[in-house]
Amino acid sequence: MYTVFLAGGIASGKSSVARALERRGAWRIDLDQLSRAVLEPGSECVDEVAAAFGDDLVDTCTGALDRGALARRAFADAESTARLEAIELPYIRRMLVRMLEGEGCCQTNPCVCVVEVPLLDRMEPMLNLADEVLVVDCPLEVRRVRAQGRGMDVADFDRRAALQPSDEYLREHATTILDNSGGPSDLAARVDEWWASREAARWKEARNG
């Protein structure tokens, strides 16, 4: 199995690349979805979150977590955010490992898995699982304009961007960088070129040449 960790800042086009690779036959795993999955009713992660942030977050009848209330408490300050991540991340990482070691990817042809990683620095201990780290790169100013075009408030964009790994960090940890400073057709061409080059190499590990 050829595993790609796909990263990029907010409004960089990361999800567009993930969808494009999925259309070409890659098995797609979105870590945002995994972060929601580990907080399903009855999970150990929910128990730990409730112990840290308040039992009143959990519905006593359904066991469902009030995610909105959790967000308000956990993202109120950096210390609370770090506490939530310290609880969630081990569960997310274990779930990812189980999925990568399972048979899901083997049902695709070629046997390629793309893992959409919102915060690459939080997954740094697991970069050894990736054959390639593919980073979608786009200037902050361009991303800000794109986010505005989708209806996002500028202050909200800047707040979210500040919480993410820096562009310098992403470039430093990238095996390959996809430039997305142009339009959709430019990005599509770069994705096609990347896919074709990996097919030609028979999906050999890019990091080791």
Describe each PLM feature range.
Residues M1-L65, D192, A196-G209:
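Glycine-rich phosphate-binding loop of ATP-dependent small-molecule kinases
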Residues A20, R24, V46-A50, R93, ...:
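An amphipathic alpha-helix signature
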Residues R24, F53, L129-A130, E172-A174:
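Short, structured coil segments at secondary-structure junctions
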Residues R28, A130-V135, I177-L178:
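Short, well-ordered beta-strand core segments
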Residues D32, L84, V114, L178, ...:
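Residue-level signal for inorganic ion chemistry
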Residues R36-C111:
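ATP-dependent small-molecule kinase phosphotransfer cores
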Residues M95-L96, R122-N128, V145, G149-G209:
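Small-molecule kinase domains that catalyze NTP-dependent phosphoryl transfer to phosphate-bearing small molecules
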Residues V97-N109, C113-G149:
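ATP-dependent NMP and nucleoside kinases share a basic, alpha-helical "lid"
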